[in-house]
Amino acid sequence: MEALAAEVGRVFGCAIETGTVIEDLSFALDQNRQQYHSTLILDQLAANTPQHFLKTLAIAQVDLFIPILTHVYGEAQLGGTACVVSTFRLNESRSGLNIAPRYIERIVKEAIHELGHTFNLRHCPDHTCIMHYCRNEEDVDRKSDELCRYCKIMLEDEIKRLKT
């Protein structure tokens, strides 16, 4: 968590607090799919976020989905306050016994990506930009951990807007 907080703070230029917002995710479990509906988690996050938080990122170790996709690495409220990232599919070893060499790096990239959406950043066509949409772990590995020039400008503009 410390590495994640440091990287998020570096990209967004803000102080980071860590803690638990939601303990039990069973309310979002779809029994038929044996996956967790990420939109339901977002709704709870937004409702339970402390007032003094600008944004809230949840890191979940469960398999997330939205109804139109088989799985998602994360989901965010575009321009909102909440986002969630799943670590479940970012590790080649689902057993948790063998951690993929790039596991932490993938979590950091997806966390920054989802937080970017909360700052109104859309998916970017630049394959190296952290805001590029990823279909699989290889896509996550291929993109950098940085915003492209265009997305960086958009983020700076959004942060300025939020400060006024």
Residue ranges and their predicted role:
Residues 1-111, 122:
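Metzincin-family zinc-dependent endopeptidase catalytic domain
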